[in-house]
Amino acid sequence: MNNLRYWIWFTQAIGYCTTKAKQLTFLYNSIEEFYLGGESEWRLSGLFNNKEIEKMSKIPLDISDEIIGKCITYFYDTVCIDSPEYPKCLFDIDDPPAVLYISGALPDIDDRMSIAVIGTRKASMYGIKSSYNMAYQLSKAGVTIISGGALGVDCSSHLGTLAADGVTICVLGCGINYDYLRENAKMRSDITFKGAVISEYPPDTEPKSYHFPQRNRIISALSDGILVIEAGSRSGSLITVNSALEQDASKKIFALAGPVDSHFDGSNKLIKNKVATMVTDYKDIIDAFDNVYVTTELDVSAQPSDDVIDVIPIKGKPPENINGLKTYDLSEVPQHKENLNLSEDEKSVYYAINYEPVHIDKISEITNLPVFKILPIITTLELRGLIKCVQGRSYRLI
């Protein structure tokens, strides 16, 4: 606890995503020794410029006390960079976090196979379904799933792991006590029963745009391999891949091949350029580590059904708990979303569909549009996550 106080002070003065915390662990017996050395010692270390030394001089040590009090009040755990419990795989990167704030219990990440499942927040239904199923299957094989707790691919991979009664780590780009994406609050709570929600930022820290690239280095460091589910050419997932390869050039990168369209430009390019290994099945990932980890045999009879997509949260709707999973009471959700920026034909097709399956011939009858015009519109609505195909050529709202 004593070291914690000094490490929190250090982060408040110097910030996050810095190489200097790790360097201090080699130069001093403790962070307390460094602090007590004062300005003269800080200069002698050769690590800090005048502006940083001035800031350390002005930041009082008791700035840490409120943060520690918050952790005690909400039963959050903390692990400092110089603690024996600090993950070795995280310490090994150039800029490991000085402090990790933890809700739940951090799994033994160094001795258990872990895969980061990443992708776009605006995932297609193919991406949502694939991330859920891959996380489910990998979890059944004993793999820890790591992701970022965002909407889309992150959320569905966490939920797939929970459905498999597996272990998952959610790495946030804000404080673990901040009400980030309220609709995912129940999911984050469920994660803590067998895994952990973690952050390098103090509990009440608001998310900033630059936090997420910083967060990505933690996701990549904690994982043995990275699975890219769906990424466009400018996706943040590519930042995670780059971070992983900068940390360890031999890090295994996997990607799910997708349609030849903008949603999968980044994923397909990783495969084309041989940065990532193409995967079509969870076993492709397991086999890549067969000389490193022993995994459990997957119970094939326990495969998730197509209905799993119904439990993926919708932005802005508070979650409920149904059979241990997170879903939404669709009876309370307006049948059709507003302000979707659809063309007139797209609106006609969208409003012809409801929560009961509607055949494409019926849609044609309602809209007075020929089927050949409806088909590309259907594809657009599916990619935007507004509808899904449920049987044959029938569709329903999501």
Identify the function of each model-found stretch.
Residues 1-129, 133-140:
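Short, positively charged patches
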Residues 3, 80-398:
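Glycine-biased, small-residue-rich flexible motifs in mid-sequence functional cores and linkers
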